[in-house]
Amino acid sequence: SDYIAMGLLCGLVDRGVKIPEQVEVISTGTSDIDIYQCLRPSLSIVEVPLEKMAYQCARMLHAIINHEVLSEREVNLPFRLCLGNSTLG
């Protein structure tokens, strides 16, 4: 989660670990959390559409519960990579 990645990043920096040279840190979540920009180094994020993902999961689960045939078994949703300074990429 975002908060685990932030805690990990801060803990590594406090212990003198060179980010991203020795360890790279990336999180999944949303880039609208302002604290990401305050972290040093800034955190890289794979932004996933959580609301769309939850909607699709609920829709598919509803179909399964009602013994309906699923129109698809896999749903591809867009993501966005927001590079910070916690990764080399």
Feature names for model-found ranges:
Residues 2-89:
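Flexible loop/turn connectors
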